């Protein structure tokens, strides 16, 4: 037996122990790495909600719990961090987060993350969401001072639930802070009429009935900020009027008594009276048996004759205030193109009067030819804001900010539109006899919205009208507040309420440092704006400023136009809407992150908002089985429903009108996905997924897998796959990439 001496193995043990210590020290050092991201809030107003998307370099963050926000003094402030996407399949680390916080007095903040960092969960105020998924259930949101409920369905059921109003069925405001009681109810919703899209045709007016079918807590819902998606349909009495889908996203905030409502409707009417042929247009045919003959269409006057028009569109609340109500609003003193100062207005409604604020402008339906400014002078006398008691003389100006308050001596409701002027016509109306407050995205007090063509000529290669299936999203603010000094905590409660909604109408813009966006490589290799290439940067700035200048000079405003740009300048006139060709909105997002310029952010947001809705086809969709009922029969009933349009998710071609020409390749989702990442806009990803589904269906056969259809689809699918990790989209993308590679050798 060998005699092993201790000294013969001692050096090995010491060596292994040393390696172990060094390894753990290296691990400790690696874990202690932290990252600091400078964030600036432009045009800051303290205590304003801030939501921004921040990209994270690959391999540096695996949990959103390891992220916090510091103020300008290095102190952690309450924040809500949401994991949005990862670097998969390359790496399981986080690629995008949403950072939410309320701004403070200073403009500068730091987002900090690392393995030794934890979010302190410093929540002195939180909100809660209870979402009952039953067919006659409801969603209840409680922010602390505000509680509201949205009912689902047409009523009845096991609990004999009331029919939904289509919007907020009950709103309570707890000014005393002692819990919600019966006398805290400040507004309710009229059954099926708190959300409306009324259609007018030759048979007369057909008022809608709104039915909520589904409520969802969106990604990004947490203790400080909730996003509630409300899906439903408008139903009509006459069978010739198709049901129309709507989606609302309601944003609520901890400790706040205001909400932001993003209201999206889809137009499902028959836009004009031309004689329809059976079949499809040659440019977008999915078969070869039935092809439309466009020759007789050129002689059909029905294209210029409106059929189903929008008579009224908007939201309504029935307020529960005292009889001694007063209404407040304001308008700008200057010309429409130079709004600087405002004049305030208030009057008592005496329990029976109605009051409205209406913003109008030229060519409401925006059917060409469009009236615009000349080369050297602005348009004059074409925009009008009017306000006053209904039935009496009204005051007028050219432009109004777009808010109204109805209040008694204790409580009030203030409602406002984003882009009240730019997306005219809009109206805010209070009827103190009926106790209703109406926010009209399209008011019945102007001519109905028409979707007819300007003529029956060819427009971008087609004689067609594809208005059926377009959508539009409108943003509104609803603020429920106290009106006396004690309940509001303000020395001037009405002024502060107005200032609050005006801040929310044009909120501050949060932006991480351009260097961080570049370092993350979330957008690939990207150079930030720099003096190193001053001449190049100057040319870029001139291009973007020139586009903004023309948008505001002409102006390219109106509900169906705002966010888009005309393309060609010929014989002193701008012509042909761009319709996002090619990815115009995306370049604004890129320039925003390169520079931090808040003006670029606002144009990017408006451009994406327009193109994803107006410049796309959204209806009729294939039936979707959600599975929110207990009966298995429902799945088979859904499957037996007719299939939708093959063109869902396909964009529109540049044309003189937004809805007169389609082409299979013409859709660009990069800006929409960027709005989802950078701005938390769920609508952007929602519409991008419509395009992904369109690719998966391959409705154009081999045609859709060649030429620019192929390379544009690869770009679009790459953006959507990165955001969703959907295996069906991934398989479609990889097959198309393989085809594109093979074409290099064939």
Identify what each model region corresponds to.
Residues 11-23:
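Bacterial N-terminal signal peptides
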Residues 539-552, 604-619, 682-703, 731-746:
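Long, well-ordered core segments of solenoidal/helical folds
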Residues 459-461, 465, 569-581, 651-665, ...:
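Solvent-exposed loop and edge beta-strand segments that line ligand/cofactor-binding
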Residues 70-97, 453-455:
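Solvent-exposed beta-strand/loop surfaces of large extracellular or lumenal domains
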Residues 138-512, 557-560, 576-579, 663:
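Beta-strand/loop-rich accessory regions of lumenal/periplasmic or secreted enzymes
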Residues 264-268, 477-482, 584-598, 613, ...:
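Well-ordered alpha-helical scaffold segments within catalytic/enzyme domains
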Residues 55-75, 317-329:
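Solvent-exposed beta-hairpin/edge-strand motifs
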Residues 120-159, 163-166, 171, 332-338, ...:
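An acidic-aromatic substrate-binding cleft motif
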């Amino acid at each position: 037996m060998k005699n092993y001496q201790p000294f013969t193995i001692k050096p090995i043990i010491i060596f292994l122990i040393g390696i172990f210590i060094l390894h753990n020290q290296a691990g400790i050092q690696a874990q202690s790495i932290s990252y600091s991201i400078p964030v600036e809030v432009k045009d800051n107003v303290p205590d304003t909600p801030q939501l921004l998307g921040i990209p994270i370099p690959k391999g540096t963050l695996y949990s959103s719990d390891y992220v916090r926000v510091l103020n300008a003094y290095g102190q952690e402030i309450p924040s809500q961090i949401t994991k949005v996407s990862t670097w998969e399949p390359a790496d399981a680390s986080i690629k995008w987060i949403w950072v939410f916080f309320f701004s403070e007095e200073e403009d500068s903040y730091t987002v900090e993350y690392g393995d030794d960092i934890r979010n302190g969960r410093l929540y002195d105020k939180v909100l809660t969401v209870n979402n009952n998924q039953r067919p006659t259930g409801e969603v209840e949101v409680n922010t602390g001072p505000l509680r509201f409920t949205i009912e689902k369905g047409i009523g009845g059921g096991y609990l004999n639930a009331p029919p939904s109003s289509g919007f907020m069925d009950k709103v309570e405001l707890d000014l005393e802070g002692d819990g919600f009681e019966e006398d805290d109810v400040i507004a309710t919703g009229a059954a099926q009429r708190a959300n409306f899209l009324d259609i007018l045709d030759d048979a007369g007016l057909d008022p809608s009935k709104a039915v909520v079918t589904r409520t969802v807590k969106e990604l990004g819902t947490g203790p400080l900020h909730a996003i509630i998606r409300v899906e439903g349909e408008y139903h009509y009495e006459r069978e010739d009027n198709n049901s129309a889908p709507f989606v609302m996203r309601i944003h609520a905030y901890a400790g706040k008594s205001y909400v932001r409502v993003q209201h999206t409707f889809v137009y499902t009417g028959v836009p004009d009276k031309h004689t329809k042929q059976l079949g499809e247009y040659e440019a977008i045919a999915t078969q070869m048996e039935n092809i439309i003959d466009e020759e007789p269409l050129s002689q059909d006057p029905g294209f210029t004759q409106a059929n189903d028009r929008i008579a009224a569109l908007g939201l309504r609340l029935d307020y529960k205030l005292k009889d001694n109500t007063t209404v407040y609003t304001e308008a700008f003193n200057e010309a429409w193109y130079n709004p600087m100062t405002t004049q305030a207005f208030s009057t008592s409604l005496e329990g029976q009067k109605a009051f409205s604020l209406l913003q109008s402008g030229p060519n409401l339906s925006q059917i060409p030819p469009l009236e615009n400014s000349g080369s050297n002078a602005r348009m004059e006398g074409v925009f009008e804001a009017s306000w006053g008691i209904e039935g009496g003389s009204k005051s007028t100006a050219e432009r109004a900010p777009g808010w109204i308050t109805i209040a008694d001596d204790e409580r009030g409701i203030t409602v406002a539109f984003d882009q009240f002027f730019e997306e005219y016509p809009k109206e805010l109306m209070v009827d103190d006899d009926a106790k209703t407050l109406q926010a009209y995205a399209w008011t019945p007090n102007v001519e109905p919205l028409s979707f007819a063509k300007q003529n029956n000529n060819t427009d971008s290669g087609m004689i067609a009208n594809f208005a059926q299936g377009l959508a539009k999203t409108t943003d509104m603010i609803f603020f429920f507040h106290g009106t006396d000094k004690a309940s509001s905590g303000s020395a001037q409660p009405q002024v502060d309420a107005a200032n609050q909604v005006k801040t929310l109408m044009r909120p501050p813009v949060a932006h991480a440092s351009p260097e961080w966006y570049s370092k993350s490589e979330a957008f690939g290799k990207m150079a930030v704006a720099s003096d190193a290439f001053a001449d190049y940067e100057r040319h870029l700035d001139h291009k973007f400023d020139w586009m903004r200048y023309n948008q505001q000079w002409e102006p390219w405003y109106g509900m169906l136009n705002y966010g888009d740009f005309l393309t060609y300048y010929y014989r002193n006139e701008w012509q042909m809407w761009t319709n996002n060709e090619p990815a115009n909105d995306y370049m604004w997002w890129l320039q925003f992150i390169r520079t931090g310029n808040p003006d670029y952010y606002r144009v990017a947001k408006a451009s994406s908002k327009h193109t994803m809705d107006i410049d796309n086809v959204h209806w009729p969709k294939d039936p979707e089985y959600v599975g929110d009922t207990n009966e298995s029969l429902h799945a088979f009933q859904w499957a037996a429903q007719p299939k939708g349009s093959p063109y869902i998710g396909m964009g529109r071609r540049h044309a003189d009108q937004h809805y007169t020409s389609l082409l299979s390749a013409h859709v660009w989702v990069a800006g929409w996905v960027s709005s989802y990442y950078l701005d938390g806009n769920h609508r952007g990803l929602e519409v991008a997924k419509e395009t992904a589904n369109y690719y998966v269906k391959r409705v154009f056969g081999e045609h859709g897998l060649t030429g620019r259809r192929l390379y544009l689809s690869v770009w679009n699918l790459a953006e959507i796959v990165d955001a969703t990790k959907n295996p069906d989209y991934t398989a479609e993308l990889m097959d198309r990439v393989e085809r594109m590679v093979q074409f290099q050798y064939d």
